[in-house]
Amino acid sequence: KEIASIEQLFLTGVHLEQYRHATYNPMDYYEEALSREPGDVRCNNAMGLLWMRKGEFAKAEAHFRTAIKTLTQRNPNPYDGEPYFNLGWSCRMQGKIDEAYDAFYKAAWNAAWQDASYFEIARIETIRGEYEKALESVEKSLTRNWHHHKARQLKCSLLRKMKYNEKAVAFADASLEIDSFNMGCRYERYLASGENSDLEKLKELMRDWSHGYIEYALDFVAGGLYEE
């Protein structure tokens, strides 16, 4: 309450988050700002992210929607796509796939969020079995961020799903030239080629590290690739 402006309340909250302060809670500062200006975009977005990290996705969604309501009062396509992107994730984590899809598309209007948004769009299209659309979307993501390694894995998966195994192997090889530790692409190369040497190389590099396997498994799950 001693801080005079909403701007400084927001910046103080950001500072506390960045430096992981042991005794001060950034949420207190965002809440104070919102008690003065309930529609503040940045503080609502920040609050939503904090609730997301706690797994409180419905609470997060409410804050993102409030931020978007303010952002779109005069302009249906806001200058900042982050609240829409975060809304997409909060909806996705609640199983609201269609709402998530729409939110990610709105976020993609903003250039800064195109690679991340089109990647999430491609994941949802893959879940729906819309592989051609998903391939178009993942290409848009890679156009904005050529070294998006998760997008590269997804493209390999889609090419293989569409029976373009040779193209999948070639793209996996190109991706491994960029990052030889892209285990998603390495695994996709094995699935597309059927060569056991690819699988053995992956196992060698993974060093039986269970957490690594879990992380890469989650990447496949996020695109509905449970079988893989």
Predicted region positions:
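Residue-level recognition of tetratricopeptide repeat
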Residues: 14-15, 49, 89, 123, ...
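Structural motif corresponding to the intra-repeat A-B loop/turn of tetratricopeptide repeats
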Residues: 19-20, 54, 94, 128, ...
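TPR-repeat structural position
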Residues: 22-23, 57, 97, 131, ...
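TPR alpha-solenoid repeat register
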Residues: 43, 76-78, 83, 117, ...
